[in-house]
């Protein structure tokens, strides 16, 4: 065997790590989410009060997230802006679904001065989707917002309404937490 036949493959192997990044874009991190919702039975609410969660999150602890396209989870989200942020997200996992749209959410939002946004929530416990306006705010020291991520609390008073109900079932969300990470930072044409 000639020496030149051995040197060419060895040289190619030596250069492979240096050339592996050429001409390729690195993939962005995969979006992930967690949320908790406590719906209570008040007024015209026609379903039993209950808690539901995707992953595990509170205002102070982030224990588990659901990652887009892992184990059947779907997370699509955008958190864009500077100073004031627009948040758009749809999360689904098994029988759980939560969609959120918030305009102008800033770090200064408090329980006394929240920012309004829209929520649509569904699970086997609600039978059909409930939707309505909610109030979003930051509590605790860990909740925050920046381009591509948000961790925020919310309540929905007077509540979310099931529009398919003949009598208009409206149920209050007493406590809610939303965590979104690795989201898009710019609104795309499809949104």
Please provide the spans of the model-predicted regions.
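An ectodomain-focused feature that recognizes extracytoplasmic/extracellular
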Residues: 23-131
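Acidic, glycine-rich flexible loop segments
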Residues: 103-185
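Domain-scale selection of a single, long terminal region
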Residues: 9-12, 16
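C-terminal motif of bacterial Sec signal peptides marking the signal peptidase cleavage site
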Residues: 17-21
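Generic low-polarity alpha-helical segments
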Residues: 1, 55-59, 74-76, 87, ...
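Bacterial N-terminal signal peptides that target proteins for export
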Residues: 1-9
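Extracellular/mature segments of secreted proteins
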Residues: 37, 51-58, 68-69, 83-91, ...
